[in-house]
Amino acid sequence: MPKITKIEVQKKNKERFNLFLDEQFEMGIDIDTLVKFNLKKGQQLEAADMAEIQKYDHYRIGLNKAIQYLSYKKRTEKEVIQYLQKEEISEQAISEVIEYCYREKLIDHQDYAESLKNTMIRTTDKGPKIYQQKLYQLGIEPNIIEMFTELYREQQELDDIIQIAEKISKTKKGPQNKVKEKVMQSLIQKGFEMETIHAVLNEMDFTQDEAVLDDLLQRDLEKIYNKNRKKYTQQKLISKTIEGLMRKGYKYDKIKAKLEESGIADGTEEIE
């Protein structure tokens, strides 16, 4: 039966020990393993004893890795499991580590959801759908997702969302209805819900300076006209130009007036 002939502190990690059986290095163990099994020089170990020691120390390695991983920031169960799998910790040990983390409140999904909610509302321009999606991707339970997404909706101030929308609006140029449409699409992409978006849009003023709009119309007209002038006959070209400008949100009467002002049309042309 193998006998412990030496136990020495590792040089690079004072919390771990080298275990020697019959003068041969057998394995490294941590101090908790040493204490749990009351290991000491001269002690004889059966194969079953060694299997238990190895199993427990593997768990301890996984636990220490998890604790260190959790020390940097809050994590979910899914994140910890994925991390330990990459660290080649066994599924059995991972299961025991997760149980320990829940028991000691190192993993707490409600606390995680609360913290993420507060951070996102305070520091991002994202709505509840993005928050909800993040929780889902992180493996949070559906009932917690539902509860905290509702809190997100309640706690995100409408005035703050209006400010987000106005910031978007300042980067968009063009006819009022088109700018409004672009703002709406941006808010959808940021995770806001349609009921909230409509409430925000109703509070905003999308009126733009007529001179600015006139310049934009002239610019877009020239761009579309010049792009297609070699492809179509004059009548078809005018029709395509009108269609293109209407898709950009310009009103038909404004387009016709600008075409006549530019000398491109004489006022008799219609869209084909």
From Swiss-Prot:
Its main location: cytoplasm. One of its GO terms (biological process) is regulation of DNA repair. The keyword Amino-acid biosynthesis does not apply. InterPro entries: RecX_HTH_1st, RecX_HTH_3rd, Regulatory_RecX, WH-like_DNA-bd_sf. Pfam families: RecX_HTH1, RecX_HTH3. It is found in: Cytoplasm. It comes from the Bacteria. Keywords: Cytoplasm. GO terms for cellular component: cytoplasm. PANTHER family: REGULATORY PROTEIN RECX FAMILY PROTEIN (PTHR33602:SF1). Belongs to the RecX family. Modulates RecA activity. This is Regulatory protein RecX.
